[in-house]
């Protein structure tokens, strides 16, 4: 389906959400994920660079990674995660309409058939199933976090989930997300991530970049943001079985200590 920019994207009937709405698949993938993760710069100093693509969908983020790094002199591992390859299979069969997938159609088709494909210096792997249950992939240097929204897929945004994810990060790592939600940012911070503002995309004037180390952030959240958290009526972290509401005194104290550390 066409989005506001005129680009063609896919829409999930099951989840009721459009992939990369407003600006289209490649503009969002390049700017939000590949650019903010500084993959080209980091691939020059880390080998192999390990990238987790969480929410493969129709592979726009994966294509943006290959576009940027396939000719890189150093090795890269791209690990894509999703419940199903159905969106990518559909995209391969409709590559001409989507446009961005045409140069990568053969690679995508091989991934669908075999679960792995090499594209230049990029080794691309697919991991099916529930990402929350654990994955057999090496710890990443960058996570392109693109599941369905907290409203449609709440289990992928909980504090407990992000705590488990953070515990697996043994290398300096960034996580990029389209969300600008105060509750999501609070959740990431309480899970252990340092959290910062990301660049605009589409109708959003900010996105989110989280990291294991504060020096990986360009614009870390600060005391002014904490003031907004304090005043918000929906800043409580997204816990399993929890409800939206203001942040508790205990959570705010922990958040303040982490942000101001």
Summary of predicted features, one role per range:
Residues 1, 96, 119-120, 206-261:
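SAM/dcSAM-binding transferase cores
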Residues 141-156:
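A short SAM/SAH-binding and catalytic strip from SAM-dependent methyltransferases
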Residues 185-211:
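Conserved Class I S-adenosyl-L-methionine
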Residues 142-144, 171-179:
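Conserved beta-strand signature within the Rossmann-like core of class I S-adenosyl-L-methionine
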Residues 155-172:
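A short glycine-rich, Lys/Arg-flanked "PGG" loop and its adjoining helix->strand segment in the class I
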Residues 1-52, 156, 160:
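S-adenosyl-L-methionine
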Residues 39-139, 159, 191, 201-202, ...:
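The AdoMet/dcAdoMet-binding core of the Class I SAM-like
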